[in-house]
Amino acid sequence: KYLIHNDKPTYKEPPKEISFYAYRRINHFKEILSQFQAKETTEIPDEIIETIKQQIKKERIEIPHLTNKKTKEILKKLGYNKYYEHITFIKDKLGIKPPIMSPHLEETLCNLFIDIQVPYAKFCPTDRVNFLNYYYTLYKLCELLGETKYLPHFPMLKEQKKIEQDEIWKKICDELKWDFIPTL
């Protein structure tokens, strides 16, 4: 295969395949940011919200004390697993206000997310198919920026997955000269 001179990536731009994946990833990252803040446009039938309310009442949980973890347990118990990614939205419907980020913080997070694409491609294990977990990445970027008030709101990975992702994240941080903070 020959590269036509114009198709050669310059030192300023990553190869086209990285750009393509980065474009898809940044859109997914923005979607995760929206879900996290319950800004998503999703429809959850009223009867599902009512069933969740009944379960909360049955378990004698005060709504202000409803955690993401407990909400996930309730969804699982009710067979509503497909709504896991909408937990913040569901809690908002129950009267629990979601965490809100400033537009400036969102923009900063998106820019940092774009910054990690080339180092990720460089250090990604060859047997790895997917990108880093998006909530893990959002957690690490907020941690890096000192935005610790958001950290308790992110669903975290199981221990082994954290270790695997931390190994890649450490290499990315080293490459970008960012502080690496171990997750465990």
Language-model-derived ranges and their functions:
Residues 1-184:
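Non-catalytic, interaction-prone regions of core transcription and DNA-replication machinery
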